[in-house]
Curated annotation (Swiss-Prot):
The lineage of its organism: Eukaryota, Metazoa, Ecdysozoa, Arthropoda, Chelicerata. Gene3D superfamilies: Vaccinia Virus protein VP39 (3.40.50.150). This is Anamorsin homolog. Residues 235-249 are annotated as: Fe-S binding site B. Monomer. Belongs to the anamorsin family. [4Fe-4S] cluster binds at C235, C238, C246, C249. It is found in: Cytoplasm; Mitochondrion intermembrane space. A motif (Cx2C motif 2) lies at residues 246-249.
């Protein structure tokens, strides 16, 4: 397989599993002879790739499976290799056909960010070549919108003027406007009857005010409860004074008061005499 190496290229050989020393030694010798520098060829186990601390964008080519073609690269491994390659760097894969899903591998390569993916095969091996894009992953580029000259400047100017037109400029004579004074009638300004605003809290069952009641039912129930506690006279003369009160009158001992005046009695006064 032609790896497309040149003099000065920095190469990473990736292996996994059981490696034959003579095969690895021969491959390293061939690559060193091509790049003309022994230090430019490095060998790495794929299992230790994340711990190797290689600099990003530091390799011109990565050879995967050239020594151990039975290896199967994971998606994480492909992403890590992409970060190690320089822009336009090459990734070459040589893998055995046994239990190899070529379509899935090509899909994972494209999904990881590789471009120019091409596949070939020999008797026992599948050979795949791909490249890193000619830019760094995550880099940004300014689009030349500001320098572009519009071919239809007059049309653009007319479009921009539309936003500055007033309502009278765009209205047709046949279009009838709604009179804003007719949107709200006199009935809308009338204050509603409070009785119509009360909610049917509880329906026909025992009325119970809701929590944080706003319809007035809570105040009404409080008044009813206070009226039940307030003692009522059976003779109607309690307000005149003790001379007109019965012996069991709860107001006994209190000064005379006006009819309808609210009198607060203590619990001792409400208790029956023993």
């Amino acid at each position: 397989m032609d790896y497309g190496l040149q003099e000065g290229s920095r190469v990473l050989i990736l292996w996994d599993g059981q490696v034959k020393a003579d095969v690895l030694t021969e491959l390293v010798r061939r690559i060193q002879a091509t790049v003309k520098d022994d230090k430019l060829c490095q060998v790495e186990n794929s299992q230790q790739l994340g711990k190797s601390h290689h600099q990003t964008s530091s390799f011109d080519a990565v050879l995967l499976g050239a020594v151990t073609p039975d290896m199967r690269p994971t998606s994480d491994c492909l992403v890590d290799l992409l970060s190690l390659l320089k822009p336009n760097g090459k990734l070459s894969l040589q893998l055995t056909k046994t239990d190899l899903d070529c379509d899935k591998l090509v899909y994972n390569l494209k999904l990881s960010g590789y471009v120019d993916v091409s596949m070939g095969s020999s008797t026992d091996l599948v050979e795949i070549k791909c490249s890193k894009p000619n830019y760094e992953m995550g880099s940004s580029s300014k689009l030349p919108f500001s320098s572009a000259v519009s071919s239809n400047q007059k049309s653009s100017a007319d479009v921009s003027k539309i936003w500055s037109l007033s309502a009278q400029d765009v209205l047709d004579r046949d279009v009838e406007l709604v009179d804003p004074d007719q949107l709200i009638s006199e009935e809308d300004f009338k204050k509603p009857d409070p009785s119509t605003l009360k909610a049917s809290c509880g329906g026909e069952k025992k009325r119970k005010a809701c929590k944080n009641c706003t319809c007035g039912l809570a105040e009404e129930l409080d008044k009813e409860a206070a009226a039940k506690v307030q003692p009522k006279s059976s003779c109607g003369n309690c307000y005149l004074g003790d001379a007109f009160r019965c012996a069991s009158c709860p107001y006994k001992g209190l000064p005379a008061f006006k009819p309808g005046e609210k009198i607060v009695l203590s619990e001792d006064q409400l208790a029956a005499d023993s």
